[in-house]
Curated annotation (Swiss-Prot):
A cellular component term, taken from the record's GO annotations: cytoplasm
Gene behind the chain: plsX
Gene Ontology annotations of biological process type: fatty acid biosynthetic process; phospholipid biosynthetic process
EC number per UniProt: 2.3.1.274
Primary subcellular site in the record, as a coarse category: cytoplasm
Gene3D superfamilies: Isopropylmalate Dehydrogenase (3.40.718.10)
Nucleus recorded as keyword: no
Protein name: Phosphate acyltransferase
Molecular function via GO: phosphate:acyl-[acyl carrier protein] acyltransferase activity
InterPro entries to which the protein is assigned, alphabetical: FA_synthesis, Phospholipid_synth_PlsX-like
Location of this chain's protein in the cell: Cytoplasm
């Protein structure tokens, strides 16, 4: 039976075109069913331009409101009760969809997901995990990249557990280290004593876990392929992510400018074109889809606001893989197994349950 993915069709900068085209690509390549959530008339018009909606495994669910990129997250989440984000996440909570994908306002997406779905038992704070390429042709993940600006050491310990589970399950067969992912803490030095109070205390907690913990990892080693799961607070993670995105863009432009300087270089480029195509693809964020919010009672993925159809297609793919590998069930088991060491018997997850009903 196909996995059903609810897509916020009004989320991206150029919505709904990337969402609709990405959904159409996804149903052609993967065994999935897609629910497009948004303004019904707009979606029917755009979808009808591509194919007859009734002949596709695509359903449209109406949502009268849209949370824009300029909306303040906290206010929009509370006031726009019929937003495409909120309606899509409700579909997951009600079992009508297996996962939710949005390329909309990141802050609003994270806040809405926490409110509508709630956290898994034992999870204090869900974390946003970003997948990035390494020089060894394997992927790695960084979390948190923005869901929690301020963290406690036990939060980073839980991030390590959730990130390790995600990598071990979803990257099985894709990475030589999937059976025993190497977990590290992003810090300013490799020694246990380096870093601030948060990273030093987190180090003590993470090393007590039955994980392949490699210790502290410096920022310069982010892409060298020597670590599979890198843990940090959301402030540091988001800064690292944005710097990486900016660096990739700069390198591309510098390379393009350099290759155009002489005829000899242009000829060299033509002779090596396939290598450059491969290089570009490895650095293309759209190939990695969306970032999962780990630790929720449901699967939710957040993509880049500038997502194109390929990014949406791949976000649907990774969301389906997440569901297929039962990542949430695995996270719940590992968190429960470590609960005594974590000391989180009074999880904030209980406080979040039913929060939407009170909103």
């Amino acid at each position: 039976m196909p996995i059903t993915i609810a897509v916020d069709a009004m989320g991206s900068d150029k919505a709904p075109t990337p969402e609709i085209e990405g959904a159409l690509q996804a149903i052609r390549h993967f065994d999935v069913r897609v629910i497009l959530v948004g303004k019904q008339d707009v979606l029917r018009e755009h979808l009808g331009a591509h194919a007859h909606p009734g002949r596709l495994p695509i359903e449209i669910v109406h949502a009268s409101e849209v949370i824009s990129m300029h909306d303040k997250a906290a206010l929009a989440v509370r006031s726009k009760r019929d937003s495409s984000m909120r309606v899509g996440l409700r579909l997951v909570r009600e079992g009508k969809a297996d996962a939710f994908v949005t390329a909309g306002n990141t802050g609003a997406a994270m806040a809405t997901a926490k409110m509508v779905l709630g956290a898994l038992p034992g999870v204090d704070r869900p974390a946003l995990a970003a997948v990035f390429p390494t020089e060894k042709r394997t992927a790695a993940i960084l979390l948190d990249v923005g869901a929690n600006v301020d963290c406690k050491p036990q939060n980073l310990q839980q991030f390590a557990i959730m990130g390790e589970v995600y990598f071990r399950t979803v990257f099985a067969g894709k990475s030589p280290h999937a059976r025993s992912p190497r977990v590290g803490i992003l810090s300013i030095g490799e020694e246990e004593t380096k870093g601030n109070e948060l990273t030093r205390e987190a180090y003590k907690l993470v090393k007590t876990l039955p994980l392949n913990f490699v210790g502290n990892v410096e920022g310069r080693d982010l892409f060298n392929g020597n670590v599979d799961v890198l843990v940090c607070d959301g402030f540091v993670g988001n800064v690292a992510l944005k710097i990486s995105e900016g660096l990739v863009k700069t390198v591309r432009e510098m390379l393009k400018e350099s290759l155009q300087q002489t005829i000899a270089r242009q000829v060299g480029f033509l002779l090596s074109r396939q290598a450059f195509v491969d290089f570009k693809k490895r650095l293309d964020y759209s190939e990695y889809g969306g970032a999962p919010l780990l630790g929720l009672k449901g699967a939710a993925f957040v993509g880049h606001g500038s997502s194109n159809a390929n990014a949406i297609k791949n976000a649907i793919r990774v969301a389906a893989e997440y569901v297929e590998h039962r990542v949430n069930e695995a996270i719940a088991r590992e968190i429960a197994a470590a609960s005594e060491k974590l000391g989180n018997h009074h999880s904030s997850a209980k406080k979040e349950e039913g929060e939407e009903a009170r909103a």
